[in-house]
Regions:
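Active-site-adjacent loops and short helices of periplasmic peptidoglycan-processing enzymes
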Residues: 2-161, 165-174
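Domain-terminus/edge residues, biased toward the C-terminal soluble/receptor-binding domains
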Residues: 140-144, 152-157, 161-330
Length: 330
């Protein structure tokens, strides 16, 4: 038994993780460093996790000023008949964009997804083209979309790595965040009818720090989840594709989060509030010296208890008068 003990103590930390799904990944949000992965580039069906792209494109339309959260979206017979996970929208009426977005985020609603796609691009098919163009732009090499819902389709796949990259993009939208962490809500239809919304991502209720994510499940994809959690200013993204049960996928993502938070932390390498160079001499200036700051904070992922090794280099090539506070000098 003494041998056994020794092996356990010397086991590499990563070996402690037993994630028996088709694919999995744990990524540091800030640096996109992959902490753990298994089969993370394999092309697999990901079911409703396809909707991360549908949501991203919807928020980008809002960003561009092509629509707003208040925009009234007309529904079609086609959208209302989608089946699968849905919020039972009525055809031939108008819903506020925000209500449809909320239905996609919380309930993974196929009908609401198609209504948004049809509004944005005129048809789901045209919207899918947009999805694939965006995937190319984001260098998602192992992703191909055939619809905006994730309903089974022969030519449709993604991978754990691409799903993580996509959720990172979506998390930049404050409005997404405000809804993705909500556990229960309701959708009030134009007729006054109400549909209960319960977040399909149970971890927003049962895992402290988990505030976002997208579930997916079909018989071919198995049970999937891409989720994000934050503790002490350290954010992780975890992906599980093809778990055997709904509970198993939540357990696996919980294990990934626990592992990441227990073993890693985010260290600030460059703090934008502290001068990189103090009293830098500026040529031909009335006020001869100035402090120079980094434009943004830079973080480094580090294993707990280890010093992080790095070099900081900068080039100051534009520090000549006239200069005002906030000017870029290098």
């Amino acid at each position: 038994s003494s041998n056994m003990q020794k092996n356990i103590i010397w086991a590499k930390n990563e070996d402690v993780l037993q994630i028996n799904s088709k694919a999995s990944l744990l990524m540091d949000y800030d640096s996109k460093t992959v902490i753990y992965e298994n089969n993370s580039k394999a092309r697999l069906p990901v079911a409703s996790m396809v909707k991360i792209m549908t949501l991203l494109l919807t928020y980008e339309e809002i960003d561009k000023g092509n629509m707003s959260l208040e925009t009234m979206i007309p529904t079609t017979e086609n959208a209302s008949k989608m089946g699968g996970s849905q919020v039972f929208i009525d055809p031939y009426v108008e819903y506020k964009a925000e209500d449809l977005i909320k239905s996609v985020i919380m309930m993974s609603a196929n009908d609401a997804s198609v209504a948004l796609a049809e509004y944005i691009s005129g048809s789901e098919k045209a919207f899918v083209q947009k999805m694939n163009d965006k995937a190319k732009e984001l260098n998602m090499e192992n992703t191909l979309y055939a619809n905006c819902t994730g309903l089974p389709a022969p030519e449709q796949y993604s991978c754990a790595n691409d799903c993580a990259i996509l959720l990172k993009k979506l998390l930049k939208y404050e409005h997404y965040h405000s809804l993705s962490k909500v556990w229960m809500d309701k959708l009030v239809h134009p007729s006054g009818r109400e549909t209960e919304l319960v977040n399909t991502n149970k971890l927003v209720r049962y895992y402290k720090g988990c505030d976002s994510g997208k579930t997916g499940s079909t018989s071919e994809a198995g049970y999937c989840l891409t989720a994000s959690a934050e503790k002490n200013d350290f954010r992780l993204i975890a992906v599980v594709i093809g778990a055997k049960t709904g509970q198993e996928r939540f357990n696996y993502v919980t294990e990934l989060f626990n592992y990441g938070f227990a073993n890693y932390e985010n260290k600030t390498i460059v703090d934008s509030k502290v001068p990189v160079v103090e009293n830098y001499e500026i040529l031909q200036a009335k006020c001869k010296v100035a402090n120079i700051y980094a434009q943004e904070d830079y973080y480094g992922l580090s294993k707990k208890g280890k010093e992080i090794g790095y070099d900081i280099s900068y080039e100051i090539n534009k520090a000549k008068a006239p200069l005002k506070s906030g000017d870029i000098v290098g």
